[in-house]
Amino acid sequence: MKEIKLILTDIDGVWTDGGMFYDQTGNEWKKFNTSDSAGIFWAHNKGIPVGILTGEKTEIVRRRAEKLKVDYLFQGVVDKLSAAEELCNELGINLEQVAYIGDDLNDAKLLKRVGIAGVPASAPFYIRRLSTIFLEKRGGEGVFREFVEKVLGINLEDFIAVIQ
């Protein structure tokens, strides 16, 4: 496995199933899988920061990122590759040291350039072909956690070490 120094993720279609709910007053709702919070835990446990890159700009994503202590949040991103390159420059790392999980067309350029690329099983086939790591879960089913655990090689010994 490559030495990863940053984990980046999309939100819709990864942390969620891609569905969006609106109430009668226009409020947007998203359903997050709480299992994905363990992905943040494991990354931080190994000293690796996590960043969100999403094309949407919503208060609910900001609140979720804040609650989980996500290190970097970029909303309303049009060009995810450029945003990731800028962050890498700030951190003094290169894209080969980044693991990224995304699920659709606006993720493709970045998926092609990072050290480890993950794609949920629910993504279109032409996006899944960009994945360098096999993921079984679909978006909204804890795929971010699965991705982080595979990228970092989390195993039973790691789990036992944190519960003792």
UniProtKB/Swiss-Prot annotation:
Binding site for substrate: T34, T54, G55, E56, R64, A65, E66, K67, K80, N106
Pfam families in alphabetical order: Hydrolase (PF00702)
Family annotation (Gene3D superfamilies): HAD superfamily/HAD-like (3.40.50.1000)
Keyword set includes NADP: no
Top-rank lineage group of the source organism: Bacteria
Binding note for cofactor: Binds 1 magnesium ion per subunit.
Residues annotated to bind Mg(2+): D10, D12, D103
Catalytic activity reported: 3-deoxy-D-glycero-beta-D-galacto-non-2-ulopyranosonate 9-phosphate + H2O = 3-deoxy-D-glycero-beta-D-galacto-non-2-ulopyranosonate + phosphate
Cited InterPro entries: CMP-NeuNAc_synthase (IPR050793), HAD-like_sf (IPR036412), HAD-SF_hydro_IIIA (IPR006549), HAD_sf (IPR023214), KdsC_fam (IPR010023)
UniProt keyword annotations, A-Z: Hydrolase, Magnesium, Metal-binding
E.C. no: 3.1.3.103
GO-annotated molecular function: hydrolase activity, acting on ester bonds; metal ion binding
Primary role: Involved in the biosynthesis of 2-keto-3-deoxy-D-glycero-D-galacto-nononic acid used in cell-wall polysaccharides. Catalyzes the hydrolysis of 2-keto-3-deoxy-D-glycero-D-galacto-9-phosphonononic acid (KDN-9-P) to yield 2-keto-3-deoxy-D-glycero-D-galacto-nononic acid (KDN). Also able to hydrolyze N-acetylneuraminate-9-phosphate (Neu5NAc-9-P), 2-keto-3-deoxy-D-manno-octulosonate-8-phosphate (KDO-8-P), phosphoenolpyruvate (PEP), gluconate 6-phosphate, tyrosine phosphate ester and glucose-6-P as substrate.
Subunit structure: Homotetramer.
PANTHER family: HAD SUPERFAMILY MEMBERS CMAS AND KDSC (PTHR21485), N-ACYLNEURAMINATE CYTIDYLYLTRANSFERASE (PTHR21485:SF3)
Similarity-based family: Belongs to the KdsC family.
The name this protein goes by in its record: 2-keto-3-deoxy-D-glycero-D-galacto-9-phosphonononic acid phosphatase
